[in-house]
Each structure stands twice: as C-alpha cells, then as structure tokens.
C-alpha cells in the first residue's frame, strides 16, 4: 500500500460516466440489498478449495525472497517477478492482454532520488547533516541567506475562517511549518481539525490552499517542516522512506519533483535551533536567516503492468469483465538503513495480494466450467510510487475499459493480530478470522450486496467496515490501486487486513504470514469474483459519490 501519499490526484480528468450513472441511479428506485441473494453451490465451494495455504506459502516465499531485492519499481527483482507472473498466467491458459499480444504493459518513467551530497541546510550559519538532521520532501532549488518566517501549519480554508499566513509576509522567505501528520508532496501537513474534503471547494489557491500551494502562491522561497514528536520518534523509518526513489510519469504528470518549491523535513532539534530565543506563539517573523539547497538525481527507465484475460463462457456476457488485481511492487533496498537487514521484502505489502490473485487465477483455470463473464487480472506496478501502474492502465487501457463492470483489489491480506499483542503498532491489525472490507458499498449497492452476501453464505469472515467512515483520517480507499478504477466509474472493493509493526519495514518477511487466514480470504474473494461474473446485469453506480471521485 502506498504510504507517502494519501495520494488522490486532482489531475483534471473528466469522468462523465460518474455524473451520468449517478443521475440514472437517482431516477430509478434504490436497489435493495435483499434483491441480490447469493447462494454458494457445492461445486463453487469445491472450486474455491483449489486455493490452499501451502500453495500461497510456496508462491510468497518466492515473491518475497531476498533475491527479489524488495521488488522496487523499477528493478531487476521486479522484472523477475513480472516474468514469473506472466509465465504462470500463460501456463494456466490465460490470454495475454497487454501491449502487442504480450502479458506486459510498458510504462516509461523517470526515476528520481535525493542527491544527499548536494542537498544542504544551514541555519544561522550552522550546517546540518542530510539524513541525520533533515531529509528532502519534494522540489529542487536554492534559497540562500533568506529570512525565516513561522507559518503554523500553512493552511488556507476560507469557508472555515482558517488562514495560517494571515498578517505574515512570506514572500522571498523560507517558511517554517509545524508538522501535523506525516508530510508528503500533496499535504505537507494534514488538514486542520474539522476540515473535510467537502470543505475544500472553490478555486484552489484562492478559496482554499494546502501548505505547498499557499506558500508557492505567496512567493515563499522554500519550506522547512519541523517534525513533531511522533515523527521524531521514528526518524530512522522517516529517513528511509524519504530516501527512496520516486517515479515521474513525465508525459502526463507535471514535473513537480523539479519545479515545486523546495521542501525539507527537519528534526525537532533543528526546529529548536530555528525557534531558539523566540517566545512560542508571541512572535511569528523570526530573526534568524537560513540557506537551503535541494537537489535530485534522475535517470530514464521502464516498468510494467502484468495483464492477463480469462475468457468467459457466455457468448454475450463474456465481452464484459470483472477486474481483479494487486500491486506486485514494494520499496526495494536501502543500503543506508540501520541494522543488518537492508531489504524490504514486502511479504505482506503486497506479496500477499500478489499471490492471492495468482491463487485465484489458478482456481479459475482448474474450475470445471468457465465463469459467464470474463476475468481480467492486472498485477500493477509502482503502487508504492504513487499508484502509477493503476493510473496508467486506467488512462491507457489495453482492453475496452467500458466493459469492466467491477474491480477487486487485494492489498495486504497476510497478517493477524495475536492474542496478548500489546504493541501499539499492531492495534489496528485484524484477527485470525477478520479483515477490513473497504468501499464495497461506496459506489454500488449491488457490489455491496454481492460482496457481503458471498461472505455470509460462505465462511462468514469478520468484515470490519470502520475504514469506510468518511471521517476516518487514514483514507485507505484513496491509497491503493482500486482508486483509479473508481475514478473511471468502475465500482471497486478492497480487502486489507491492517497495518502492523513491519509495515514498510525490513521485517515484512514471509515467515510472519498467517497462511490459513490468507487461504480463507482468498477463497472468499474467489467466490465473490465468481458471483460478480454471474450477475444478470452489471453493478450500477447508485450512491452519492465523495468529492475525490467527482472532481476530475
């Protein structure tokens, strides 16, 4: 799962299918959940039993082996994994559905990484050390010997009376912000308390502005975000996260990595240097000057989605597809990481989803009968770099995207909270019979009815729906690959067993996976997929959509 984003992109894509589908839905009677009755036949149960814990274990130990070097996008280990997935799809009898009759969809990207030697920060003449004292967040450029000005959290939300730069002249200065949540290039600080996405209406930069937009529009020379205690307490992880490469899809995304205002994240000790001698809250315009230089290194590379088609049996319905996918990349190797383990194996994130999809593909191939509709499998690349693979596929599909009736996404289904576990990092991890179900009823009543009905008729897993709460700050629905299908007007549902102590850490190993739980979840997803392929009519978008899915 993509950590650094909460990355829904306001990229101006217009998806008229949303508004038209929603209008039709409003004119028709609401579909009652009871109208979709799911019955699992003995034959279907037998088909699901082709998925086994042993099978999942064997595949995952290969996918998450040290030899794959953490499956960074792009990397040799990721290419090996892609070739393995394509080979397995071919052996199982799937049709290639990528570019030019292959299983691959190639994506040209630019790979950026921080230039630690050239990225510098000095405050009142004191030089700080990259990595130990500060890291790059985004942007490039120089801001030499500039005054510092404190700008709070940096937000403007006129409808809520919030203006953190009110009365402050930031032009030509380096703005100091107090961290609120983990910074990323879309939100350097989290939205103010009580502000929802629905409040961010009107022209961006005028009626409302995130800190980067507000500082840029106000003429600031650079930004330093000062870590809070939570960030400071996990500085090694923070340093590793911001030290990794990032990808730019040059032809279609703005080159914010180079053109954005230079932004650094600094430790609290650096913040103390900046705030030294200043009475907190009494003075905003600070006396000290600072100099910052932010630089990156770049190279051109390719990365690939892996796409396969299992054709349905119905002569009419087989033109329609249920898409099921996962991301097969992780975050690679960090030679500067503390300790002996430098490889982020990504067994749970998202090796578990990758092999879960593979096991479902194998169950389809072993079934005595084909589904009515076709099944499209997409193993997405570069989810960890900003949902790049899924966005690319949805903007440049290798199949007729209008015929994709639903999307199933599997991202992190391998871990269980053990009895007596008091580690706060595991507080939201699901139990041995549980999983979080996200988005099932967000867009379509029918998708929700099939998803919930299948579980009730089968293994009765404990589905936790808490992340569907619009007020939930994790915003998981907007952080994995199903999001771009939803943007395309395709109802999507997401299985996820929760974050844990090894999330985006080198300890995410295959020997920590609960394979019995993975088996249960994968079997349930297989049958959910099967029931969707068997529907008389495709699921309609009949729900009031959140702003992130309509402002395109």
Range-by-range predicted roles:
Residues 34-96, 319-321, 542, 546, ...:
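N-terminal hydrophobic or amphipathic helices/low-complexity stretches enriched
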Residues 130-254, 259, 311, 342, ...:
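Extracellular/luminal Protease-associated
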Residues 332, 472-519:
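Zn-dependent metallopeptidase/amidohydrolase metal-coordination segment
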Residues 361-388, 410:
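Short helix-loop-beta-strand segments that form the rim/entrance of peptidase-like active sites
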Residues 38-44, 124-167, 251-346, 362, ...:
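Soluble metallo-hydrolase cores and metallopeptidase-like ectodomains found primarily
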Residues 126-129, 166, 252-254, 261-272, ...:
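Metal-dependent peptidase/peptidase-like ectodomains
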Residues 362, 366, 496-552:
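His/Asp/Glu-rich mid-to-C-terminal helical/loop segments that flank catalytic regions of hydrolases
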Residues 69-189, 303:
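Noncatalytic luminal/extracellular "stalk/propeptide" segments of secretory-pathway proteins
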């Amino acid at each position: 799962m993509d950590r650094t984003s909460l990355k829904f992109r306001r990229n101006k894509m217009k998806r008229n299918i949303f508004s038209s589908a929603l209008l039709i839905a409003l004119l028709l009677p609401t579909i009652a959940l009871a109208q979709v009755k799911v019955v699992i036949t003995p034959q279907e149960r037998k088909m699901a039993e082709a998925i086994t814990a042993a099978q999942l274990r064997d595949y995952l130990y290969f996918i998450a082996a040290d030899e794959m070097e953490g499956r960074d996008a792009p990397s040799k280990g990721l290419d090996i994994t892609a070739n393995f997935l394509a080979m397995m799809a071919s052996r199982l009898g799937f049709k290639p559905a990528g570019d030019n009759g292959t299983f691959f969809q190639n994506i040209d990207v630019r790979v950026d990484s921080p230039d630690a030697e050239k990225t510098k920060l000095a405050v009142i003449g004191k030089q700080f050390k990259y990595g130990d004292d500060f890291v790059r967040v985004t942007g490039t450029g120089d801001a030499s010997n500039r005054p510092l000005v404190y700008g709070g959290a940096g937000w403007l939300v006129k409808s809520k009376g919030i203006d953190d730069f009110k009365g402050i002249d930031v032009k030509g200065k380096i703005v100091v912000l107090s961290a609120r949540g983990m910074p990323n290039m879309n939100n350097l600080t989290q939205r103010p308390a009580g502000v929802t996405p629905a409040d961010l209406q009107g022209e961006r930069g005028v009626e409302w502005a995130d800190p980067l937009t507000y500082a840029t529009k106000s003429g600031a020379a650079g930004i330093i975000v000062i870590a809070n205690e939570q960030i400071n307490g996990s500085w090694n992880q923070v340093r590793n996260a911001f030290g990794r490469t990032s990808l730019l899809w040059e032809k279609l995304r703005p080159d914010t990595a180079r053109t954005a205002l230079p932004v650094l994240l600094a430790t609290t000790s650096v913040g103390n240097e900046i705030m030294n001698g200043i009475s907190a809250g009494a003075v905003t315009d600070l006396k000290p000057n600072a100099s910052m230089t932010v630089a990156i290194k770049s190279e051109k590379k390719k990365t690939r989605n892996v796409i396969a088609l299992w054709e349905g049996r119905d002569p009419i319905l087989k033109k329609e597809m249920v898409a099921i996918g996962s991301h097969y990349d992780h975050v690679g190797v960090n030679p500067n990481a503390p300790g002996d383990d430098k490889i982020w194996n990504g067994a749970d994130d998202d090796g578990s989803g990758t092999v879960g999809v593979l096991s479902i593909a194998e169950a389809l191939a072993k079934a005595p009968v084909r589904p009515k509709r076709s099944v499209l499998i997409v193993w997405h690349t570069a989810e960890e770099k900003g949902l790049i693979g899924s966005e690319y596929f949805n903007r440049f599909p290798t199949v007729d995207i209008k015929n994709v009736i639903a999307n199933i996404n599997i991202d992190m289904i391998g871990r269980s909270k053990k009895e007596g576990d008091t580690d706060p990092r595991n507080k939201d991890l699901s139990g041995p019979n549980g999983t979080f179900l996200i988005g099932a009823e967000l867009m379509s009543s029918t998708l929700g009815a099939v998803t919930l009905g299948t579980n009730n008729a089968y293994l009765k897993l404990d589905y936790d729906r808490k992340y569907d709460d619009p007020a939930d700050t994790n915003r998981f629905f907007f952080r994995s690959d199903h999001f771009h299908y939803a943007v395309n007007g395709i109802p999507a549902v997401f299985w996820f067993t929760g974050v844990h102590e090894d999330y985006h850490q080198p300890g995410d190993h295959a020997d920590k996976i609960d394979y019995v739980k993975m088996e249960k979840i994968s079997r349930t997803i297989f049958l959910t997929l099967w029931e969707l392929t068997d529907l008389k009519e495709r699921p309609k978008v009949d729900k009031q959509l959140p702003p992130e899915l309509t402002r395109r």
